[in-house]
Regions:
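Short, charge-rich amphipathic segments
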Residues: 1, 37-38, 43, 102-106
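Amphipathic alpha-helical interaction surfaces in cytosolic regulatory modules
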Residues: 23-97
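Residues that form or immediately flank small-molecule/cofactor binding pockets and catalytic motifs
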Residues: 8-10, 82, 104
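Non-catalytic signal-transmission and effector/linker regions of two-component phosphorelay proteins
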Residues: 1-4, 112-114
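A charged, well-structured terminal subsegment
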Residues: 99-114
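STAS-typified acidic loop motif
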Residues: 2-31
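General small-molecule cofactor/ligand-binding pocket signal
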Residues: 4-6, 78, 100
Length: 114
């Protein structure tokens, strides 16, 4: 899966290009992001293009969260479509992973993290 990777200061911003995050691409999504993280432990997933996510896609997001959490960091989501947000809320992912309306809000939320 193609993922646009950008740095904003010490925050890695990853934007999945595909409209679906599911069984067909979740492993490559997870691999690309974890490979790009390096020593970075602040991750924003910009979900602006994602229209659908299934359990494997949620698992990939959780895997990325575990990876950054193990390094003392965090993962934030932004620009999540209503259908995707419903799935994330159904599995209660929004309780362990903050969701922001915009990329800037998500990036700014890291200001208090070392």
């Amino acid at each position: 899966m193609d993922v646009l990777i950008e740095r904003d200061g010490d925050v890695l911003v990853a934007t999945p290009v595909a409209e679906h995050l599911d069984l067909s691409n979740s492993d490559s999504f997870r691999h690309e992001i974890i490979s790009a993280l390096g020593d970075c432990h602040k991750l924003v997933l910009d979900m602006e293009r994602v229209e659908f996510v299934d359990s494997r896609g949620c698992g990939a997001i959780i895997s990325c969260l575990k990876n950054v959490s193990a390094a003392g960091g965090d993962l934030k989501l932004c620009d999540v479509k209503p259908a995707v947000r419903s799935v994330l809320e159904l599995i209660r992912l929004h309780r362990i992973c903050e969701i922001f309306e915009t990329r800037d809000q998500a990036i700014y939320s890291f200001e208090s993290l070392p």
